[in-house]
């Protein structure tokens, strides 16, 4: 099974995270940031991943350190669980509607970290979650996993719906990218490595 578990402890946060790429029944997320828990649960459910997160952070300051560090650890687990990347599709993309909003995510498991994030989040806060942290989370995942990630909110009026569409699209796009493909021998690259 392709899986990884990591613990990251700093003076600001303590993150314990396990990711299973090939098992989707065990999802448990507790970060201390309610809206973020909801988004991570949606990501795992729509990507069909197993995901367990226990996080403690300095949320009395704000949620920034917790959100960013969860992204770092998730990206690290993703990178480790993919091992040599043989036989995977490598690329994945998904459009996901959430009522009036439409989100799009495209992923390349390239070994090169890069992110493009486009979208207007008009409501600055949802519960205890600063909406600008959405981009910070995706940036942390992309850099830690060494993937290229494009995340775009095409349109919408409800900030919750916009972010939810992105997290669901992220799950679906990542599922497509990590899935094994019987037609791919070795690594899906003319270089012979990723």
Swiss-Prot record:
Family matches, as Gene3D superfamilies: Imidazole glycerol phosphate dehydratase, domain 1 (3.30.230.40)
Keywords: Amino-acid biosynthesis, Cytoplasm, Histidine biosynthesis, Lyase
Pathway: Amino-acid biosynthesis; L-histidine biosynthesis; L-histidine from 5-phospho-alpha-D-ribose 1-diphosphate: step 6/9
Recorded catalytic activity of this chain's protein: D-erythro-1-(imidazol-4-yl)glycerol 3-phosphate = 3-(imidazol-4-yl)-2-oxopropyl phosphate + H2O
Enzymatic class: lyase
Record GO cellular component, one term: cytoplasm
EC number: 4.2.1.19
Classification via SUPFAM superfamilies: Ribosomal protein S5 domain 2-like (SSF54211)
Top-level taxon: Bacteria
GO molecular function: imidazoleglycerol-phosphate dehydratase activity
Subcellular location field: Cytoplasm
Alphabetized Pfam families for the sequence: IGPD
Biological process, per Gene Ontology: L-histidine biosynthetic process
PANTHER family (alphabetical): IMIDAZOLEGLYCEROL-PHOSPHATE DEHYDRATASE (PTHR23133:SF2), IMIDAZOLEGLYCEROL-PHOSPHATE DEHYDRATASE HIS7 (PTHR23133)
Family named by the database record: Belongs to the imidazoleglycerol-phosphate dehydratase family.
HAMAP family, sorted: HisB (MF_00076)
Protein name according to UniProt: Imidazoleglycerol-phosphate dehydratase
Species of the source: Bacillus mycoides (strain KBAB4) (Bacillus weihenstephanensis)
The encoding gene: hisB
């Amino acid at each position: 099974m392709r899986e990884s578990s990591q613990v990251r402890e700093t003076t600001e946060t303590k993150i314990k995270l396990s990711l299973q790429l090939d098992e989707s029944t065990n999802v448990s997320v507790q970060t201390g940031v309610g809206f973020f828990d909801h988004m991570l649960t949606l990501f795992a459910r729509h990507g069909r991943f197993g995901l367990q997160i226990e996080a403690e952070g300095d949320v009395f300051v704000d949620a920034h350190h917790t959100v960013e560090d969860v992204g770092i650890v998730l990206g690290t687990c993703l990178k480790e669980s993919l091992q040599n990347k043989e036989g995977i599709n490598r690329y994945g993309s998904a459009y996901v509607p959430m009522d009036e909003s439409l989100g799009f995510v495209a992923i390349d498991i390239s070994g090169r970290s890069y992110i493009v994030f486009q979208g207007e989040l008009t409501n600055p806060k949802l519960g205890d979650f600063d909406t600008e942290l959405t981009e910070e989370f995706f940036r942390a995942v992309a850099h830690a996993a060494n993937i290229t990630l494009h995340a775009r909110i095409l349109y919408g009026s409800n900030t919750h719906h916009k972010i939810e569409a992105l997290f669901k699209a992220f799950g679906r796009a990542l599922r497509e990218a990590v899935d094994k493909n019987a037609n791919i021998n070795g690594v899906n690259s003319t270089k012979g490595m990723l």
